[in-house]
């Protein structure tokens, strides 16, 4: 009888299991972020992915917020990316939660997702309590600020920190977060960012101590005209929505032992001095009035440590000198213990990204450590370095516990590429590794060592590559806000954002304000940048119109003192033998960049149903295309006939249909005869070339150029020991740079054949391009719906796509 009951129970359980849906939702996000505590919107957007053990499509969803705030009810829709909240507007500081469930086409519902936290930040007319405070101004000193306070009860405790400069927060001696270099960047003369931390696990009933360590970072007189010679901070800690403590004159402060050694201008990022003997010597803080700077919520992920890199080699190179090789170039914080020192002993630490024989402090910086005689441990706190090699001077015993903490903005990744060609794999990995190192602090820099600026040209060059391999919509939203804040009253834009001082570039650099929002929309189905910054795009094009002569953009002036930009570049950092200074080439490149901006404005106006704008920009585009061809086409060549001069007109629709074959043939002929089959272009040309060869199916030509081992080329870099992409093809200046990362998307969209037909990859075409000699390829590309994987062996192609993505059948 017992055996019969057991068998019946098993049958019942199996039957129940068969009735359960075999799908679930995962990776829930609000505004593109995982459980954000302080968003800047009262009506956010929700996204989720679906895991299923068999093919399916979402037929309906249901979202609950609160759950008392909003219940969508069952909504018949397959939408699962950036689904808008439709309840009553949320309020400033409101903390709530949300969840979702879905139905498949057979009417079966998934389980509800786990509840996800959702918090609204300090928005609208709400303001943080308290005042900006600082301490120990001058000499680059970082400060430690503290306050004892008492709470009557514990609960949900949130700490809001708005710092001008970097900060770290400690409650009762414990660091409140594993984030580093907080907050993200902003245009600090216009906007600062508020970061919120959940400190519920650290607060206790009764007396507590809150400490804030702050370092000036970008907030300096020489960069953003700082009103105080040091970092400042305003902070507030709430328990269950009730303020418990905030920054004001009752706090005390002192020196935490760190000092900034640089002015944060080009070649001047220096490093940090740490005096391990320092005592805070507590004194009253300075209260500083800050006006005309908007404080808004940080809407991108923080920087976090992604990898701990340890040395591959270390040797003594002098009586008190030690050389360390970490094996690859990284953007990192150094951590080291230094034994055998006496109090007051000084150790200098030098860095190099290029050579074990050359340590230039103006390139990769340096640090200084002053020993206490015991517990001598150094770690970067408010600065970082680009390095492969480290040289210690003043240390007689070998350094111990050496680690490099490679960090970046904590976005989601998951891309991979492999093929039958190890050299091609090496190029892909070089580019991917470089981009990850350069995407930190809520923007992407040219190089983190020499200039550390968010150049628009470098951004345009790498945007499609980075957005192909990572979930960086929040990062681009933060970066684009800095561009909008940098715009001048006449509509002019600088070449970098944030914009602490003048920097070189040209119209292609400024067009980031147009190109980046369109790419964010196509790659993530996120309309926020497009909608938020559309007025800035139009204002910039009005500025451009002022310097249009006979239908063509011409040289614009260097703005008056203080200048916020210089130069009027076409292409940049092209190899030797390519004249990027040719005036006709410069005008052609800049007018093609303008045509590309008009193309994207037409598309964005379509999406936003702005019919008059769409018609206006379409007319401007067609007129400009005609003028470019009439002006720059001569006997089969455009302008100087360089690769970028030939390809950019092809990309933006300038070349008449009847001339395309002739122009392409001439391009290839000149590549062989003038450039020996090599890439022969620079920062602007690489992404332009990549996008054109992908669209045109020119995989054999591209593959042939990438396979060249001599100068210039990626294999030339690798053959000469590169572990990051160089700033110049010949290796000058930075060895970890954003100039030439524009080829990254080609591995996925051409060789993998993954082409987005609808925003966010909701509908795709999968048609791998097959260059001769490449036997097989396997790629995985992350999308807002989940990963797409494509495998090609010979002519045979297989793929898997996530739920929510449909594949267009090939003809």
Label every model-predicted segment.
Residues 2-11:
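Sec-dependent signal peptide recognition
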Residues 11-19:
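Hydrophobic h-region of N-terminal signal peptides that target proteins for export
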Residues 23-449, 474-475, 494-498, 528, ...:
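Extracellular/oxidizing-compartment recognition motifs
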Residues 157, 161, 333-351, 393, ...:
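Alpha-helical support elements that line or immediately flank enzyme active sites
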Residues 166, 232, 246-253, 399-430, ...:
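Active-site acid/base region of carbohydrate-active enzymes
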Residues 229-232, 246, 250-276, 297-302, ...:
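Non-catalytic C-terminal accessory modules of carbohydrate-active enzymes
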Residues 269-274, 450-451, 469, 513, ...:
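C-terminal capping/lid segments that line or modulate ligand- or cofactor-binding pockets
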């Amino acid at each position: 009888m017992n055996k019969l009951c057991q068998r019946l129970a098993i049958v019942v359980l199996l039957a129940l299991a068969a009735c359960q849906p075999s799908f679930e939702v995962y990776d829930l996000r609000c505004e593109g972020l995982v459980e954000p505590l302080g968003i800047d919107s009262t009506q956010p957007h929700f996204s989720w992915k679906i895991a299923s053990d068999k093919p399916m499509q979402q037929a309906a969803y249901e979202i609950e917020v609160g759950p008392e705030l909003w219940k969508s009810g069952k909504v018949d829709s397959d939408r699962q990316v950036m689904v808008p909240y439709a309840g009553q507007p949320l309020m400033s500081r409101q903390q709530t939660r949300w969840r979702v469930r879905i139905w498949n086409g057979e009417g079966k519902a998934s389980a509800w997702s786990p509840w996800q936290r959702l918090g609204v930040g300090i928005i609208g007319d709400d303001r943080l309590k308290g005042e900006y405070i600082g301490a120990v101004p001058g000499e680059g000193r970082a400060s430690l600020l503290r306050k004892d306070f008492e709470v009557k009860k514990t609960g949900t405790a949130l700490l809001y920190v708005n710092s001008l400069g970097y900060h770290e927060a400690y409650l009762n001696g414990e660091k409140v977060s594993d984030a580093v270099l907080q907050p993200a960047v902003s245009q600090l003369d216009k906007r600062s960012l508020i970061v919120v931390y959940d400190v519920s696990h650290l607060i206790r009933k009764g007396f507590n101590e809150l400490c804030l360590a702050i370092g000036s970072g970008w907030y300096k007189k020489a960069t953003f005209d700082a009103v105080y010679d040091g970092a400042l901070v305003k902070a507030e800690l709430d328990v269950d929505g009730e303020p418990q403590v905030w920054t004001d004159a009752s706090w005390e402060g002192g020196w935490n032992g760190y000092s900034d050694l640089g002015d944060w201008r080009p070649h001047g990022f220096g490093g940090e001095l740490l005096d391990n003997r320092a005592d805070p010597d507590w004194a009253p803080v300075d209260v500083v009035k800050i006006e005309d700077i908007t404080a808004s919520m940080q809407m991108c992920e923080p920087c976090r440590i992604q990898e701990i890199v340890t040395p591959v080699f270390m040797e003594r190179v002098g009586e008190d000198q030690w050389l360390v090789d970490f094996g690859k170039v990284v953007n990192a914080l150094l951590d080291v213990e230094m034994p055998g020192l006496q109090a007051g002993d000084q150790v200098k630490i030098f860095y190099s990204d290029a050579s074990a024989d050359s340590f230039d402090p103006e390139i990769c910086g340096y640090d200084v450590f002053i020993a206490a005689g015991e517990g001598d441990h150094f770690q970067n706190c408010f600065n970082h370095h680009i390095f492969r090699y480290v040289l210690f001077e003043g240390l007689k015993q070998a350094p111990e516990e050496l680690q490099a903490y490679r960090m970046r903005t904590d976005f989601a990744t998951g891309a991979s590429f492999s093929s039958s060609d190890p050299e091609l794999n090496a190029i892909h990995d070089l580019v991917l590794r470089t981009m990850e190192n350069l995407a930190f602090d809520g923007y992407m820099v040219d190089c983190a060592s020499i200039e550390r600026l968010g150049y628009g040209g470098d951004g345009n060059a790498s945007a499609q590559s980075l957005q192909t391999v990572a979930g960086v919509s929040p990062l681009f939203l933060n970066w684009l806000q800095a561009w909008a804040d940098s715009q001048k009253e006449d509509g002019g834009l600088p070449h970098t954002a944030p914009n602490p001082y003048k920097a070189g570039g040209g119209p292609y650099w400024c067009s980031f304000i147009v190109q980046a929002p369109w790419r964010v929309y196509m790659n993530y189905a996120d309309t926020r940048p497009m909608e938020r910054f559309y007025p800035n795009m139009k204002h910039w094009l009005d500025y451009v119109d002022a310097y249009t002569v006979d239908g063509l953009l011409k040289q614009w002036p260097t703005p008056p003192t203080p200048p916020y930009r210089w130069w009027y570049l076409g292409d940049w950092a092209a190899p030797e033998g390519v004249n990027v200074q040719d005036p006709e080439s410069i005008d052609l490149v800049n007018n093609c960049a303008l045509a590309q901006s008009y193309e994207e404005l037409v598309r964005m106006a379509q999406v936003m149903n702005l019919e008059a704008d769409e018609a206006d920009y379409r007319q401007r585009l067609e007129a400009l295309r005609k003028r470019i061809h009439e002006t720059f086409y001569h006997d089969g060549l455009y302008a100087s006939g360089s690769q970028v001069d030939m390809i950019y007109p092809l990309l933006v629709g300038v070349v008449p249909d009847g001339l395309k074959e002739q122009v392409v043939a001439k391009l290839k002929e000149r590549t062989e005869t003038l450039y020996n089959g090599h890439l022969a272009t620079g920062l602007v040309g690489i992404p332009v070339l990549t996008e054109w060869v992908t669209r045109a199916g020119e995989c054999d030509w591209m593959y042939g150029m990438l396979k060249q081992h001599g100068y210039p080329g990626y294999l030339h870099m690798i053959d000469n020991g590169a572990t990051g992409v160089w700033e110049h093809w010949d290796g000058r200046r930075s060895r970890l740079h954003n100039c030439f990362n524009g080829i990254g998307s080609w591995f996925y969209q051409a060789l993998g054949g993954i082409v987005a037909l609808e925003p966010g990859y909701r509908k795709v075409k999968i048609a791998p391009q097959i260059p001769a000699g490449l036997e097989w390829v396997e790629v995985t590309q992350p999308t807002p719906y989940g990963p797409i994987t494509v495998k090609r062996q010979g002519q045979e192609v297989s793929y898997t796509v996530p739920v929510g993505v449909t594949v267009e059948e090939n003809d």
